[in-house]
C-alpha cells in the first residue's frame, strides 16, 4: 500500500492526464492500468531544427527537435491469473522516475502506458509516437511490428535478448547487448592483453556441448587466429585436476583461462583451479561473462585472486554518486530498494528520450551519434545496413587483488 501511494505521489510531480479510467496498484494482488495512461513530464524548452541529407538523394529531410517527446510503454502489467509481475512494475517505476528527471532537466515527455494483457487494441495509441518501449518478449514484439509494417514507428526491445533476431528485418532497437557482442568484446580484451610468453587455455567439461556464449568465444578466437591449449575433464575428477592446470600453464607468462561450459558447478571448479595456480608459482587470469558472479556458492575472494576479467550487460557501481542519488530517490518515492529491472526501466527510457531530444525526429538514423552511460547499462550503436539497431555497449569489470573492482 505504501508503494501505491508512492507511485501516485510521483505522478503528482508531473502533469497527468488520462482519457479513461486509471488503476495503479503496485504490490502483490495489485492491478495495473486497464486502459490508456498518459504521464507528461511537463517542462517547456526551446526547440531547433537541423537538416540531414540522405546519401544519393538531393532532397533534404528535416530532423526537427520536437517540443514534446511521445513515448509508448507497453508492458504485461497484469498476468492472466489476475496478479502482477513485480519485476515489470519495478521496470515501470524506474521509467516513471526517468520521466520525472527528464522533465526537471527540460525535456518534455508524454509517456503512454499500455497493459499488453488487457486485450485492448494499441494501434491508435501508437500513432504519432517517437518510439514504443516494449512489448517485453520477442514473440510479442514480432506480432506488434507485423501490425505496424506500414507505419514509421520504432519498437525498443528493453529486456529480451532473443529480439536481436528481429533487427535484420524490422524497425527494432535491441537494447540488451547480445551474447555475440559480449563474446567479441571479451576476445578483444584478451587479445589486447596477450603477450608472447602468455598462454590461452580453454577448459571444457567432458561430454558437454558448449553453450551459445562459449561457441561465440571459440569462434572469435579462431577468427582472429589466436591459438589456445585445451583441457577437458569431468567434474568428478576435480580432485585430480589441479596438476593438469599446472602442466598446461605458462611458466614465464600468464595463463589466460576461459571456461567453455554452461555448468555452474564446473565453472566454479575452473575458478577455484585458476586461483590455485598462484600457489604453484604460476599466474592465471580468468575471462568470463557476468553469469559467473550469479552462481551460488561462488567465493568472491576467488574472483579477485584470479584477477577475473568479466564482460557484463548490466552492472551497478554503488560507489557512484549518480547511483546513490537514484537509490535514495527511489527509496523515498517507492519505499523499497530498486532491483535491476528498476535500473533498466530508468536507463532505457532516459536514453531513448535523450536521443530524440538531441537528434530530432530522425533520431533512429542518427543513433550512432549519441552514446550514453546509464545507471547499469551502456548504450552504443554503430552504423548498420539492416532495418534495426543493436546495442554494442558492454561493461568490462576487473576484479583486482585488493578486492576493488575496476570498470573499463
Task: Give each language-model segment a name.
Residues 15-17:
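N-terminal signal peptide c-region/cleavage motif recognized by signal peptidases
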Residues 2-8, 20-408:
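Extracytosolic ligand-binding ectodomains
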Residues 11-12:
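Repetitive helical segments and hydrophobic/amphipathic motifs
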Amino acid at each position: 500500500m505504501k508503494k501505491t501511494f508512492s507511485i501516485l505521489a510521483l505522478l503528482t510531480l508531473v502533469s497527468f492526464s488520462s482519457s479513461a479510467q486509471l488503476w495503479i496498484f503496485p504490490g502483490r494482488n495489485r492491478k495495473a492500468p486497464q486502459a490508456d495512461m498518459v504521464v507528461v513530464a511537463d517542462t517547456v524548452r526551446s526547440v531547433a531544427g537541423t537538416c540531414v541529407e540522405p546519401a544519393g538523394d538531393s532532397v533534404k529531410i528535416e530532423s526537427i527537435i520536437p517540443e514534446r517527446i511521445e513515448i509508448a510503454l507497453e508492458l504485461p502489467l497484469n498476468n492472466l491469473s489476475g496478479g502482477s509481475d513485480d519485476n515489470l512494475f519495478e521496470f515501470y517505476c524506474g521509467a516513471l522516475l526517468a520521466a520525472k528527471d527528464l522533465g526537471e532537466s527540460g525535456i518534455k515527455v508524454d509517456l503512454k502506458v499500455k497493459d499488453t494483457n488487457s486485450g485492448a487494441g494499441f494501434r491508435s495509441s501508437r500513432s504519432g509516437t517517437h518510439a514504443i518501449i516494449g512489448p517485453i518478449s520477442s514473440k510479442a514484439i514480432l506480432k506488434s511490428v507485423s501490425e505496424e509494417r506500414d507505419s514509421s514507428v520504432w519498437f525498443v526491445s528493453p529486456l529480451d535478448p532473443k529480439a536481436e533476431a528481429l533487427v535484420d528485418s524490422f524497425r527494432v532497437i535491441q537494447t540488451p547487448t547480445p551474447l555475440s557482442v559480449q563474446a567479441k568484446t571479451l576476445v578483444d580484451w584478451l587479445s589486447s592483453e596477450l603477450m608472447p610468453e602468455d598462454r590461452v587455455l580453454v577448459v571444457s567439461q567432458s561430454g558437454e556441448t558448449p553453450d551459445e556464449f562459449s561457441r561465440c568465444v571459440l569462434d572469435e578466437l579462431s577468427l582472429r587466429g589466436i591459438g589456445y591449449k585445451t583441457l577437458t575433464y569431468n567434474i568428478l575428477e576435480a580432485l585430480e585436476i589441479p596438476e593438469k592446470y599446472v602442466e598446461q600453464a605458462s611458466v614465464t607468462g600468464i595463463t589466460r583461462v576461459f571456461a567453455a561450459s554452461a555448468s555452474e558447478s564446473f565453472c566454479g571448479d575452473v575458478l577455484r583451479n585458476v586461483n590455485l595456480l598462484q600457489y604453484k608459482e604460476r599466474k592465471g587470469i580468468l575471462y568470463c561473462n557476468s553469469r559467473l558472479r550469479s552462481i551460488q556458492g561462488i567465493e568472491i575472494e576467488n574472483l579477485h585472486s584470479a584477477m577475473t576479467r568479466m564482460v557484463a550487460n548490466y552492472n551497478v557501481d554503488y560507489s557512484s554518486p549518480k547511483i546513490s542519488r537514484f537509490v535514495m530517490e527511489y527509496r523515498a518515492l517507492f519505499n523499497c530498494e530498486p532491483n535491476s529491472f528498476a535500473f533498466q526501466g530508468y536507463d532505457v527510457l532516459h536514453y531513448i528520450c535523450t536521443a530524440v531530444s538531441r537528434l530530432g525526429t530522425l533520431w533512429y538514423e542518427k543513433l550512432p551519434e549519441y552514446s550514453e552511460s546509464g545507471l547499469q547499462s551502456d548504450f552504443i550503436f554503430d552504423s548498420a545496413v539492416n532495418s534495426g539497431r543493436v546495442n554494442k555497449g558492454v561493461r568490462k569489470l576487473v576484479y583486482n587483488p585488493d578486492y576493488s573492482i575496476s570498470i573499463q
